A protein has these predicted regions:
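Rossmann-like NAD(P)(H) cofactor-binding subdomain of soluble oxidoreductases
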Residues: 27, 42-111
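NAD(P)-dependent Rossmann-like dehydrogenase/reductase catalytic/cofactor-binding core
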Residues: 2, 7, 189-258
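Internal alpha-helical scaffold of NAD(P)-dependent oxidoreductase catalytic cores
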Residues: 25, 32, 112-204
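NAD(P)+-binding Rossmann beta1-loop-alpha1 motif at the extreme N-terminus of oxidoreductases
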Residues: 1-48
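Phosphate-coordination loops involved in phosphoryl transfer and adenosine-cofactor binding
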Residues: 9-12, 72, 117
Length: 258
């Protein structure tokens, strides 16, 4: 028999995992008038909850599901890459499983995390579980979209490329800027407006139309000078430069003349 979905205000949502994501989700739910138990430490079991959210590292999801098995009719995880099968210890005890992955970064920054307007990947082992995941996302101001288990790895890889790899690229740019006499803080402050505008142009125009710079202009002399500068300043970054140069040339080749 499938679990019945009650109104979110009828019973608490339990949050297991007191890290950045668990704390942020617990605070955001409370701010929307949803009763919350937690965030609790790993190994603790919220009582009297309609749903329990496991905000733990991916590798600990199955163990956490085992710990809370039988404690709530709905048990969910907040991992982008982990399949719902990881919740099997809880679903074997009668719970419905769901996934709720905010497509947002939760860095240890002083600014509060902005969930409103962010995408949220949802999944459910039953219509009721999927409905709960959607409702939680909407209550928090996010835009829910379905990702099935087969698509999770590709979805999460895209998220990592757009967020984590972007930081690796900016760190590389800071290093190369050092050869121009700029320290890391100076480089970050000076490059930040360029990065923001580039991302905003990508959002508004798409990658092909947003592309500017020497590759887009076909200025090979400048590209050669840039490559030589990278080789001199940080030779270990040359494979990164060459790989990105190749991708940028492919992107430029797809541009439609204005």
């Amino acid at each position: 028999m499938q679990a019945r979905l009650n109104r979110l205000t009828d019973a608490p949502v339990g949050v297991v995992g007191a890290g950045r994501l668990g704390g942020a989700l617990a605070a955001a739910l409370r701010a929307e008038g949803i009763p919350v138990e937690g965030p609790m430490g790993r190994g603790e079991v919220p009582a009297g909850c309609q749903a329990i959210l496991l905000c733990v590292p991916d590798s600990e999801t199955e163990a956490a599901a085992q710990t809370v098995a039988g404690a709530a009719p709905f048990v969910g995880h907040v991992s982008g890459a982990t399949p719902l099968a990881a919740l099997e210890p809880a679903t074997r005890r009668g719970a419905e499983g769901f996934g709720l992955h905010p497509l947002q970064t939760f860095a240890p920054a002083p600014a509060s995390v902005e969930l409103a307007g962010a995408g949220c990947a949802v999944a459910g082992s039953s219509p009721a579980a999927l409905a709960l995941a959607r409702e939680l996302a909407l209550v928090l101001g996010m835009e829910p979209f379905e990702i099935d288990d087969d698509g999770r790895a590709a979805y999460h890889a895209a998220a990592s490329m757009a967020s984590n790899f972007l930081l690796a690229l900016e760190a590389a740019a800071e290093r190369v800027a050092g050869a121009a006499g700029l320290d890391e803080e100076e480089a970050r402050a000076l490059l930040a407006p360029l990065v923001r505008t580039t991302v905003e142009n990508w959002i508004a125009l798409g990658p092909e139309r947003a592309l500017t710079g020497p590759v887009a202009r076909g200025d090979e002399q400048t590209v050669r000078a840039q490559r030589a500068a990278v080789e001199a300043a940080a030779p270990d970054l040359l494979p990164v430069f060459d790989s990105l140069l190749s991708e940028t040339r492919s992107l430029a080749g797809r541009r439609v003349p204005a």
